[in-house]
Regions:
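Intrinsic-disorder-associated, low-complexity terminal segments enriched in Asp/Asn/His/Tyr and depleted
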Residues: 1-2
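Alpha-helical transmembrane segments of multi-pass small-molecule/ion transporters
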Residues: 5-321
Length: 321
């Protein structure tokens, strides 16, 4: 079975999603709009609350920026015989992305610590300017060098231009985030009116972005979705479990445990897709279809798994500890 899975996943690699300049701009605008929506929910006092309770914040950052990439690397090593190099690199890329924008909505649904959730999403997003290229380079480099000797051929020594990645992340995440915070500060009444609609629109735009990107390869998507589904199911399950386990290990209170579970399990895979679509970062002659499919399906699946966990927790009272 694992041979069938490996060979099937190999067939994804030649898939290349080419956008013209207008298409690329549209996708960049969508991601920037999503991040602007996240920023509208950020209030300066949330950061002071985080500073008063630094333990949960530091544990949350550790869970997302260190534990998740490490657990992902271990999974990639375990799955080495059944997943292709590009699928492995797709998993590593998703783990290197910051927290996803829908995690704040899910945290409020889960009766979790919403201030911690917003603070962590904002922090990991700003830190992503450094941590996304760094985590991808470190764990991806270890994988190519030590885990899968064929990976170097398959990926033609994926030499990522770290500065280009840094610049892209800064423009798409950093700038909209800062603009959103300034907008919310200057126009608080307008912000209250538009915040919820923008966050709902964000999810619709993100799903539309994935559907449009893969519409030409929909038959392939349907043919191999089960293999991709299984890998993302396991990876996302371990991401959620990592958040919960790390929070439990450090004896955080129940509301914070829920926040960390969601923050670690919900990743900004939209950023991953935008990086993959950028020809300056991933040259068009690279066969990285496996990375595209993993990152795209993660973007859909974490909404389903996140809502599942949130609806379960919404019925459970938070334990006071």
């Amino acid at each position: 079975y694992h041979k069938i899975m490996y060979e099937s996943l190999l067939e994804l690699d030649p898939v290349r999603i080419n956008f013209n300049a207008a298409g690329m701009h549209t996708i960049n605008i969508v991601l920037s709009f999503i991040m602007f929506g996240v920023a509208l929910g950020i209030k300066p006092q949330q950061f002071t609350t985080m500073l008063k309770n630094p333990k949960s914040t530091l544990v949350g950052l550790f869970s997302q920026l260190v534990a998740l990439p490490l657990i992902t690397f271990i999974l990639v090593v375990i799955f080495n015989d059944i997943i292709t190099p590009t699928v492995a690199m797709g998993m590593i890329l998703v783990a290197a992305c910051p927290g996803g924008n829908i995690s704040n909505f899910m945290s409020s649904l889960s009766k979790a610590n919403i201030e911690l959730s917003v603070g962590l999403t904002a922090s990991t997003t700003l830190l992503a300017i450094i941590t996304t290229p760094a985590n991808f380079a470190i764990w991806g480099g270890l994988y190519v060098r030590y885990v899968n000797k064929h990976a170097a051929d398959a990926l033609q020594m994926l030499e990522i231009d770290k500065w280009q990645m840094f610049e892209t992340v800064f423009i798409l995440l950093g700038i909209p985030l800062v603009l959103g915070v300034i907008f919310a500060r200057l126009l608080p009444k307008v912000t209250e009116k538009i915040k919820k609609p923008i966050q709902k629109l964000s999810i619709v735009f993100f799903l539309a972005m994935i559907v449009l990107a893969f519409s030409n390869n929909f038959d392939l998507f349907l043919r191999y979705i089960w293999f991709v589904f299984f890998i993302v199911l396991v990876h996302n399950g371990f991401a959620l479990l990592t958040g919960y386990s790390v929070a439990s290990f450090f004896k955080l209170k129940d509301a914070d445990r829920r926040t960390l579970t969601i923050e670690t399990g919900i990743q900004n895979s939209g950023l991953g897709l935008v990086l993959l679509f950028n020809p300056k970062i991933f040259p068009p002659d690279l066969h990285i279809g496996g990375m595209l499919f993993i990152t795209a399906w993660w973007g859909i699946w974490h909404i389903i798994s996140g809502l599942g966990i949130s609806s379960y927790w919404s019925r459970k009272n938070v334990k006071e500890s």
